[in-house]
C-alpha cells in the first residue's frame, strides 16, 4: 500500500495522508461526488477532479502492482531475477512497459530457441559466443534428426543467441530510445481500388511524419483508415545506429576468427531486424495510440460535460418539432413539467406540399396550449422547417414565440429504446423524437442522461478508442454533472436518479415505484422506507436529492442531513429559525464559522453549509441565452468569403472547433483562427454550446467544407502548432438524416433540481448550451 500511496501522491501532487484517506473512503464504498462535497475534512480538501484521477489511477495501479508480483514470481521460478531486472520490473510505470520487460522471459515451449536447446544445441551456442572458435568446428560431431545439416544447425544456434540477447533489457531499452528518435509514421493507400471508396482518407494516401510529432487526432484518422482497409501504416526509422550499438555491446569487431565474427554480426543483424525492431515498432505505435485514445476520451469527456451542464430553458411550455420530408414533420407540445399535452404530424413538403394546412396546425397548437418556446431538431429539412415556423410566427406575432434549433443527435436511439417505451407507451415511436427534442430544450441534463453518451455526437474518433475505457470515463462525467446539479426526488425519472451518488438503476427504479404507490416524499428521512435503500446508501445519496415544499426546509438544499444539527446550532445562536435563515444573506454573513468548529464539523463543512443556506439549491448551470442564424443563409453554396455570421460551437477538438452556422455542415475554426493570441488548447477558448461570432474564410462547395475564423478581420494570424487541416475530413460534422426515427406521457418531470430555472421572458432570449443544441433563429419582431 505504501508504494501505491506514494506514487498516487506524486502523480496528484498531494500529500500521502490525503491519498490514504481518499482510498479508505473509496474502499468503503463512498462515491467521488460524496467524498468531494461531504468529506472535505477527511481528504483535506481534495476536489472532484483530483478524486476522479485518483479513483481511475487507483484501479489501474492496483492491477499493475498485482501483475508485477506475478511477473516477479515467474522470474524467481526461472532463476532469472537479477538485481538489475528487479529494479526495472519495479520501475515499470505502465502495464505495457511491464509486459515488454517480461516478454523475453515468458516461458515458450514452442519457440525455435526452446526446441534447439532441447536438441542439445544450447552449450554449443554458448561456446560459439564465448570462445574463439569457428562455428562450423564447434558443430563437429553434432547430430540430431531435427537438424540434419549444417545450415539448419547454424540457424538454430542463431535463434538461441537472439533469444538470449533479447533478455538484455538494458540494451533493448536503449535501442528503443535510439530508434524512437528517428521513427517516422508512414501511410500509403492500400491499392488503387481503395482510392475512390476511401477518398475521405486521401490526405494520407502518401503521407509521413515524425512519430513523436503526430497529433492524436491525425493518428486516430490514419488508424481508422487502416481499420477500413484503405490505408497501410508502417513505422520506419534508421537502422545504422541500433546495429552499431548491438555490435559494440558484444564487442563483435574484436571477435576472432573472422568466420565467427561474420556469423555473430549476421546474428546481430537478424536480432535487430527480425526480433527487436518489429517489437519496438509495435511498442512505439501502441504507446502513441494509447496516448491518442486517452486524449480523445478526455476531449469527449470535456465536450460532454459542457453539453450536460448547458443552460436549461426552464419550466416553459414547449413545442418540439422533429423535421422530416416524406414522412412529415412531427410535432409534440409538452407542459412545464415535460408532460405531453398534444402531438401531431404535418406535411408541408413534397410529396404532399400541404404548406397552408401545416401553418394552420402550427398556429393552432401554439395558441391553444399557450406555447412559449419552439424547439426545432437540426437534422434533415431543419432549415426548411425553421423557415416554415418563422412564417407562422410572423403571421401570429401576438403569440410572442421564440424558436430554437436543438441537436437531435441520439433522438432516434432514445425513441426506439425500452426507456422511451416505458415513459411514452401511448405514443408512436416517431413522435417520441419530437418529445425528446422539446424536453432537451427545457432541461438538457434531464433528457440527455437517457441516451448513451456515445450517441450524442460530441466525441473525437469516439468509435476508434477503447470502448470500455470510454464508457467508464463518460459515466463518471454524467455522474459528476448530475450530482453537481442535484435532482428533485419527487419528480425525477429513474434514468437520472440512477446517477445519484450511492444509487444504481435498480434502487432508482425502487424509488420511482415507491413514489407511485405511496405518493410524494415529504422529507428525506422517508427515503429510508424504500426497499434496498439502507443507511449507507442514504448517507451517500441524501445530500444530492432535493425535496421541494416538504416538512423540512433544509431538504430542498444541498445541506446533508448529517449537518442539520450544525444548522440548528447556528439558528439557535442567531435566535432565528431554519426557515427564516435560509436565503437570509444579512444573518448568514454575520455568522463566524470558526465559532462552530468542533470534533464533528470542520471549517470546510461549516463554510459549505453557510454558502448553501445563503443560496439554497443553487444551479451551477449558466443562464439561458439565444443566438441567431441568418434566415437568408441555409446552404453552403450561399456562403461567401468575408461573410460575418453568428453560430454555436458544436464540437471542440485538439485542432480547433466546429461551429454550426445553419447550413447543414459545420464549419471549422482552426486552432490558429480561434484568437489573436497563441492558443495551445482550444478547450480553454471555446466549449460546446458557446455562441460565437465567426467570419467565413473559405468555402469549398464541391467538398462541402467551410473554414471560419473568430479573429477580427485584418488581425495577424496567431502562430499555432503545425497541424495541417487535412484532419478536418474526418472531423467535420454533417447534418445527416436520422433515419427512420422511432415515432408519448413521461413520468412526472425528469429534470434535475438545482434551483428550478425561472422561466425567462421571451425578450431576454438567453440560450447558451446544448452544443449546437440551443440556437434561436432570429426573427424580426421576435422578442
Residue ranges of predicted features:
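Short, ordered loop/turn segments at secondary-structure junctions
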Residues: 38-40, 129, 238, 323, ...
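Long, highly charged, low-complexity intrinsically disordered interaction regions
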Residues: 56, 63-81, 87-90, 422-520, ...
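A glycine-rich phosphate-binding loop feature that marks nucleotide/adenosyl-phosphate handling sites
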Residues: 177-184, 321-325, 380-381, 406-413, ...
Amino acid at each position: 500500500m505504501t508504494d501505491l500511496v506514494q506514487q498516487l501522491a506524486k502523480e496528484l501532487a498531494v500529500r500521502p495522508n490525503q491519498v490514504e484517506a481518499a482510498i479508505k473512503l473509496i474502499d468503503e464504498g463512498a462515491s467521488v461526488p460524496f467524498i468531494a462535497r461531504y468529506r472535505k475534512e477527511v481528504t483535506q480538501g481534495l476536489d472532484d477532479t483530483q478524486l476522479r484521477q485518483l479513483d481511475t489511477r487507483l484501479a489501474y495501479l492496483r492491477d499493475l502492482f498485482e501483475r508485477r508480483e506475478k511477473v516477479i514470481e515467474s522470474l524467481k521460478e526461472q532463476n532469472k531475477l537479477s538485481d538489475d531486472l528487479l529494479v526495472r520490473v519495479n520501475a515499470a510505470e505502465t502495464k505495457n512497459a511491464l509486459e515488454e520487460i517480461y516478454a523475453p522471459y515468458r516461458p515458450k515451449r514452442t519457440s525455435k530457441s526452446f526446441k534447439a536447446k532441447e536438441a542439445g544445441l544450447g552449450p554449443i551456442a554458448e561456446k560459439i559466443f564465448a570462445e574463439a572458435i569457428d562455428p562450423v568446428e564447434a558443430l563437429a560431431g553434432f547430430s540430431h534428426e531435427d537438424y540434419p545439416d549444417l545450415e539448419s544447425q547454424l540457424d538454430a544456434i542463431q535463434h538461441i543467441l537472439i533469444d538470449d540477447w533479447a533478455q538484455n533489457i538494458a540494451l533493448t531499452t536503449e535501442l528503443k530510445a535510439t530508434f524512437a528518435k528517428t521513427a517516422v509514421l508512414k501511410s500509403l493507400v492500400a491499392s488503387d481500388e481503395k482510392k475512390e471508396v476511401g477518398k475521405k482518407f486521401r490526405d494520407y494516401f502518401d503521407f509521413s511524419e515524425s512519430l513523436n510529432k503526430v497529433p492524436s487526432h491525425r493518428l486516430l484518422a490514419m488508424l481508422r483508415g487502416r481499420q477500413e482497409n484503405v490505408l497501410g501504416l508502417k513505422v520506419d526509422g534508421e537502422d545504422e545506429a541500433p546495429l552499431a550499438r548491438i555490435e559494440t555491446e558484444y564487442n563483435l569487431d574484436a571477435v576472432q576468427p573472422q568466420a565467427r565474427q561474420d556469423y555473430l554480426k549476421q546474428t546481430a543483424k537478424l536480432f535487430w531486424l527480425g526480433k527487436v525492431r518489429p517489437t519496438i515498432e509495435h511498442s512505439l505505435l501502441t504507446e502513441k495510440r494509447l496516448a491518442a485514445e486517452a486524449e480523445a476520451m478526455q476531449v469527449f469527456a470535456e465536450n460532454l460535460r459542457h453539453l450536460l451542464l448547458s443552460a436549461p430553458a426552464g419550466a416553459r411550455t414547449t413545442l418540439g418539432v422533429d423535421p422530416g420530408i416524406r414522412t412529415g414533420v412531427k410535432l409534440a407540445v409538452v407542459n412545464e413539467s415535460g408532460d405531453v399535452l398534444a402531438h401531431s404530424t404535418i406535411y408541408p413538403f413534397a410529396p404532399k406540399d400541404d404548406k397552408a394546412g401545416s401553418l394552420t396546425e402550427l398556429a393552432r397548437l401554439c395558441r391553444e396550449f399557450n406555447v412559449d418556446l419552439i424547439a426545432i431538431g437540426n437534422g434533415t429539412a431543419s432549415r426548411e422547417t425553421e423557415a416554415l415556423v418563422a412564417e407562422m410566427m410572423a403571421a401570429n406575432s401576438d403569440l410572442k414565440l421564440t424558436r430554437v434549433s436543438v441537436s437531435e443527435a441520439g433522438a432516434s436511439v432514445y425513441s426506439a429504446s425500452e426507456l422511451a417505451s416505458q415513459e411514452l407507451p401511448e405514443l408512436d415511436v416517431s413522435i417520441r423524437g419530437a418529445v425528446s427534442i422539446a424536453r432537451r430544450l427545457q432541461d438538457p441534463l434531464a433528457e440527455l442522461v437517457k441516451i448513451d453518451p456515445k450517441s450524442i455526437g460530441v466525441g473525437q474518433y469516439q468509435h476508434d478508442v477503447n470502448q470500455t475505457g470510454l464508457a467508464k470515463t463518460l459515466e463518471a462525467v454524467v455522474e459528476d454533472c448530475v450530482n453537481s446539479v442535484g435532482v428533485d426526488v419527487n419528480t425525477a425519472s429513474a434514468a437520472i436518479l440512477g446517477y445519484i451518488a450511492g444509487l444504481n438503476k435498480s434502487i432508482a427504479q425502487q424509488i420511482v415505484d415507491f413514489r407511485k404507490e405511496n405518493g410524494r416524499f415529504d422529507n428525506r428521512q422517508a427515503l429510508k422506507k424504500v426497499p434496498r435503500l439502507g443507511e449507507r446508501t442514504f448517507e451517500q445519496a441524501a445530500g444530492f436529492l432535493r425535496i421541494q415544499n416538504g416538512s423540512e426546509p433544509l431538504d430542498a438544499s444541498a445541506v446533508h442531513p448529517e449537518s442539520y444539527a450544525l444548522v440548528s446550532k447556528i439558528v439557535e445562536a442567531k435566535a432565528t429559525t431554519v426557515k427564516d435563515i435560509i436565503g437570509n444573506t444579512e444573518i448568514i454573513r454575520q455568522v463566524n464559522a470558526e465559532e462552530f468548529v468542533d470534533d464533528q464539523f470542520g471549517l470546510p463543512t461549516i463554510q459549505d453549509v453557510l454558502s448553501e443556506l445563503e443560496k439554497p439549491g443553487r444551479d451551477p448551470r449558466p443562464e439561458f441565452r439565444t443566438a441567431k442564424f441568418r434566415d437568408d443563409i441555409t446552404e453552403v453554396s450561399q456562403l461567401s468569403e468575408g461573410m460575418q455570421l453568428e453560430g454555436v460551437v458544436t464540437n471542440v477538438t485538439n485542432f480547433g472547433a466546429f461551429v454550426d452556422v445553419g447550413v447543414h455542415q459545420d464549419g471549422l475554426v482552426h486552432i490558429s483562427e480561434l484568437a489573436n493570441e497563441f492558443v495551445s488548447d482550444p478547450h480553454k477558448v471555446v466549449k460546446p454550446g458557446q455562441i460565437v461570432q465567426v467570419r467565413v474564410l473559405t468555402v469549398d462547395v464541391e467538398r462541402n467544407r467551410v473554414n471560419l475564423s473568430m479573429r477580427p478581420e485584418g488581425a495577424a494570424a496567431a502562430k499555432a502548432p503545425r497541424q495541417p487541416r487535412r484532419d478536418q475530413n474526418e472531423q467535420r460534422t454533417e447534418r445527416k438524416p436520422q433515419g427512420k426515427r422511432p415515432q408519448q406521457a413521461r413520468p412526472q418531470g425528469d429534470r434535475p433540481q438545482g434551483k428550478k430555472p425561472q422561466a425567462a421572458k421571451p425578450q431576454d432570449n438567453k440560450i447558451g448550451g446544448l452544443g449546437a443544441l440551443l440556437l434561436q433563429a432570429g426573427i424580426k419582431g421576435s422578442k
